[in-house]
């Protein structure tokens, strides 16, 4: 069933799968970084008016019209970077990192382009503040993950993330799920900044994608899901009316990052 949705949800949960060999960029590019990561993406539906305030003109909120994250208008993207390399292949910024990104699926009102807009995030490394998108702040990030399996059978994973800001606010998420064969695919996409609406970076990725839960698609291999958000800047989004749309795990996420 997962393969029916191959073109819906790769980069930040809403990318478009493409074949790199058939994609010829129309702009000059400069490689700035390469990474090896694992990720967890939680797609949610929150109040449209509240989330629109996070997105600058000329962007507006543009939830996916179909697929496993249909109508999701806010994404938590939890990223565990196992290796970070500069353009010469040397360890960059310490060589590893963990952080969380807040992403809103956007639609450009003038061009019609649809792309993720990064509206915020947390990083433990002050060197990454405010980050390339000028929206990241410093916080502490903890991840606890266990995987249990035997022989050739699919295993069971327990993934817990805790993010704390300097004022005592937190984001906590736990997902326990039955693993399945992941979908391997490639994607390319531009991702924009809420702080500088015209700024973008170009991402080329190769991923192994495990769709854990999709309410629109009727898929559910999640045995336990908990999300708790107490950060003041997110209180208008998480007022008790938010709804889960889907959860995606990326046991492997390889990417190259370019500037135009």
Describe the predicted segments one by one:
Residues 1-9:
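Bacterial N-terminal signal peptides that target proteins for export
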Residues 14, 42, 76-79, 102-104, ...:
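Generic structural hydrophobic/aromatic packing signal, biased to beta-strands
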Residues 14-24:
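C-terminal segment of classical bacterial N-terminal signal peptides
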Residues 27-82, 212-244, 250, 257-260:
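N-terminal domain-onset segments
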Residues 83-163:
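Aromatic- and glycine-enriched beta-alpha-beta binding-site module
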Residues 136-260:
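Interaction-surface and assembly-scaffold signal
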